[in-house]
Amino acid sequence: QFNWGYDPENYNVPEGSYSTNPYLGDVRIREFKEMVKALHEAGIRVVMDVVYNHTGATADSDFNKIVPGYYYRQTTDGGFSNGSGCGNETASDRSMMRKFMIDSVTYWATEYNIDGFRFDLMALHDIDTMNEIRGALTEIDPTIITYGEGWDAGGSALKPTEAALKIYASQMPGIGMFSDDIRDGIKGSVFNAEEPGFVNGQFTFDERVKFGIVGATEHSQIDYNRVALAGGASGPWATEAAQSINYVSAHDNNTLYDKLIATLPDADEETIKLMQKQANAIILTAQGVPFLHAGVEMMRTKDGDHNSYNASDEVNQINWNWKNENQDVYNYYKGLISLRRAHPAFRMSAQEDIQNNLTFMEDIPLGVVAFNLENNANGDSASDITVIHNATDSEQVISLPKSADWQLVVNGETAGTEVIEVIKGDSITVTPHSSYVLMIDDSMNTTENFNQLLLIAGAALLVIAGTAGYIIYDKKKKASK
């Protein structure tokens, strides 16, 4: 039966069913290496989704046959602890399990030239193990990426104070955490399909969105009580924005399109499209690491299947006709990515820089979040960049930080580095369900195409998540190791 592969049996061998001949062990190894090499030659870094937190078998697993009970945590009555929800959880806090994990990731990094690791249910691992993994990978290549889910599936035998939870990110420098704060703030809870978020009508989630915009770092303009009341964190958890993996959707739970349909079953397709654009316009203009679910740029649907781990290709495949049908959404996402790459102001990481150079605009209508990036933030060519997210169903007149000739590069229909229009003055009318980006950049020639900026821009981190595979684009990385 098809399964994403979250039932590990042998951690150090590629899955054979993806090879041309699964019955010959060397074929899967050779072809996996060839795949990684080809991706590197195309300028694409490869991140593995690793599931060290549990095994497919429990009592009969290889680990349990070596030393019964040692590699798994137990409950007080002697049973197997099940913080993974899959029947068991491995004991990373025991020295030989920790050693196995370190040996395994360093093997993948050196033998297969893997560029990063995404840890499933990372909070089932202890803080010390995660820090040792980060240290071992840094010795191999400091640019290797490590991030994961800063939560578990409930009921772990590991002491909470020892677990690699999101709230303890400050104790794990160099390790990123998925931000469910901005995820559910934007679109609503993943555990309640009908619950909306900011873009689909729950405007009281605006503070949670703002918290995500500063990359979960401390900022004087964030009301953390309101963040918590909206179901988010009770305080900042990231010491730098690079620790915050900002996303709206991934392979788990509903696709963004399906979530929007579930919350607004009577909405017309054009309104859903606007929300689909705005959701990731928030992500791609926020501080932190943007993460996009593969297919979100073409309105991917799984027909409402929120847990498709064992569903067929009919559900999980990408239908490339979606791209033709939703070319406008695709181009919009592409333009936002170009904008982010061209402007380092969107890529600050230090908390102090974000505090000093990102100012939220106040006295604005409910349902609108707006901020200004100022002081040529992070060495940007633009002295000011103003971002406005209007999630309401009506036009909103928004005052700009100053009276100037503002270059509009993003509105509800178009996004990119080219100037759409020059807005003269100190206010702008923002259309419903739309995100706008305006800037003051003397280096921009408003009569020419600005795609050439991509040639000189620093690379931004962008994660494209498929079902269980992750690809990272980074122009600074060499084509292959």
Segments the model singles out, each with a brief description of its role:
Residues 134-135, 139-299, 309, 358, ...:
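Conserved alpha/beta catalytic core and glycan-binding cleft of carbohydrate-active enzymes
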Residues 11, 39, 108, 119, ...:
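Conserved, mostly hydrophobic/aromatic
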Residues 272-273, 284-292, 296-298, 302-446, ...:
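Carbohydrate-interacting/catalytic domains
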Residues 92, 118-121, 234-235, 260-273, ...:
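Active-site rim elements
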Residues 1, 50-59, 121-126, 149-154, ...:
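Short, solvent-exposed turn/loop segments enriched in Gly/Ser/Thr/Pro and often Arg
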Residues 36, 105-109, 134, 245-248, ...:
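Non-transmembrane alpha-helical segments in soluble domains
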Residues 466-481:
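C-terminal membrane-anchoring or membrane-association module
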Residues 1-112, 125-141, 145:
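Substrate-binding/active-site clefts of carbohydrate-active enzymes
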